[in-house]
Amino acid sequence: MKIAILGGGMVGSFIATELSKEYTVTVYDNMKLKLKNVKTIVMDVTQKEFQEKIKNYDIAVNCLPGFMGFKILKTLIELKISCIDISFMPENCLKLSKKAIENDCIVIPDAGVAPGLSNLIIGNIISNNDIEEIRIMVGGLPKEKNPPWNYKAPFSPIDVIEEYTRPARAKINGKIVVRKALSDIQELDVEGIGKLEAFLTDGLRTLLNSDPKISKIPNLLEYTIRYPGHASLIEKLIK
């Protein structure tokens, strides 16, 4: 199987390295990368030349920043290329569902940790249980705090900012609502780590429109975890 990885950042490079252990992998990026057993092609994926190149692959993994995600996913579907997508695009990727079906494409959107792995875990839980409320709490924390932010972006910094500014969809008392990102701050105390905070973020869009059993769950919310005080600092920065 020939796989194209679109975007060779921290996450894209890791995915490429892991997949290269079993498959033929090529990374498309705007700079040359040195990855073992992985070919890198320096190319602007928004150009026509890319559309000719991508036809030679069985599947693509879209690891581009969110602002590029929807356009590239749309292009892949039009070219009948199946895709796993981890880009945090602001657009509703489900609008491309009909075209993907028509073109016999398999598309797995929002396939990161959360959304992504969290969706799979919840799918497994609700298959055998009646659930009243689900709260997803997820976040990447640096081992060493580095004031004042006490944070290090594990993926595209642009998309980290998106987490803080994009209105968060949630389900409360059976109704889908939209809340301000960084709101509804929760305090946590995690063994071995200590006190943390969590605030609402927009990671539920595909989950809210997936398994029919989800519609029967009255309350469903996603929170992003950070060290205490982070949300307040970001709020001040945004203002």
Which residues are covered by each model-predicted region?
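C-terminal catalytic/substrate-binding lobe primarily of soluble NAD(P)-dependent oxidoreductases
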Residues: 127-239
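NAD(P)-binding Rossmann-fold cofactor-contacting core
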Residues: 23-36
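N-terminal Rossmann-like NAD(P) cofactor-binding module of classical short-chain dehydrogenase/reductase
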Residues: 58-62, 83-85
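ADP-ribose/adenylate-binding Rossmann-like module
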Residues: 75-93
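Conserved Rossmann-fold cofactor-binding substructure of NAD(P)-dependent oxidoreductases
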Residues: 45-56
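Conserved N-terminal Rossmann-fold NAD(P)-binding element of oxidoreductases
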Residues: 3-7
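Rossmann-fold NAD(P)-binding glycine/threonine-rich loop
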Residues: 87-109
